[in-house]
Amino acid sequence: MRETNGKNSGSVSPHAWRQETEGTFTAEHGSEAGRSPAGEWPTAGWSTAEPERMGMDSGMLADTIRAFRDRGVRSLVVVRAGMLVAEAYGAGLQPGTPQDVRSVTKSIVSMLAGAALADGRLRSVEQRISDFYPELKNDPKTSQLRIKHLLSMTSGLAWNNAGDQSSIEMMHSEDWVQYILERPAIHMPGRVSTYSNGDAHLLSAVLQQAVGMPLADYAQARLFGPLGITDYRWNADPQGIAIGAWAMALTPRDMAKLGWLYLKGGEWDGARVLPKKWVRESLQRRIVHHYKDGRKGGYGYYWWLKPLVPGLTGGDSSKPSPKLEAFYAAGSGGQRIFVIPALELVAAFTAESPDGEMPEELLNGIVRSIRSETPLQANPEAACRLTQAVSSFKAQPQNV
């Protein structure tokens, strides 16, 4: 196991961000449209840049980090246009410390489903689960269960989230997959959405059968290896099946790598890690989700989708504020990988907070620090404040 590094590998020239077709975003660098700044591909570690060089205000970032120091945040990493501009870690944590990301694991399972499709290990998302578990053919409901239903949590299998009852029962069972398969089918697949750790773990079991090896090994070969991710853990159930609903630990820098891969449409350093088509499909809204603040978002294939509060970014007030759409991986307690393609921004958080609104509030503070699409003038005083805020954050006791 090695610790990734964030050494600065070079300077960053002025560049402007532009939206490309089909929802992918690249950068313009000099006179060569589409060329991105140095450090875009952080396989060996993120290159760093002062926030001002990436159009961000160090002082505002410092204020945000200080404001959230006492709100249960354990660590945060901020990347813009392929450059690490800020990171902070609580006491006892280092950049190379893998942390429990909980249900962020589900989004990674979605990525692996895309890889399995690309490799021909799965025929399509229309493939029936009974191809892998023939006993499902005996029920008229479960006989119609397909991979797409597990990915969108519309299996129709009963799952009780009150007090995590079904998840706890599954964990106490001798065979987790058998527990899931024995759940009563209360809806036809595709009709009703129920957040289900059972659906995610059953998909992991299906993938493990499809690829013919432990899913953690497949993840290393097809996803983590190409991205240079080596410091991670992924626990398995009693039968050796990687737990699809939670149980992965990653470093925040590596969480940001996964977000960057998706921002780039599945491409990594000139290689196609995931099909662009899969990235688009997994981010397509399958389920409408109404947030508490009234905004309408959704759920794709284990990815959450949400429009952000308008008017967050600074800059030229004579120009209309861009409509910002985010997609993100989420785990309980505040684990997040946020991606905002229009800003070429990735933010990864780990936390232990009961406040469900905290992660987006932290993200909003980061977005507000974006003042320009071109570099700002260097601000040594603000840079000093940011350094102090990071040091103060590290001094804050954390429940690790």
Which residues fall in each region the model found?
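Active-site helix/loop module of the DD-peptidase/beta-lactamase fold
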Residues: 100, 119-157, 182, 211-246, ...
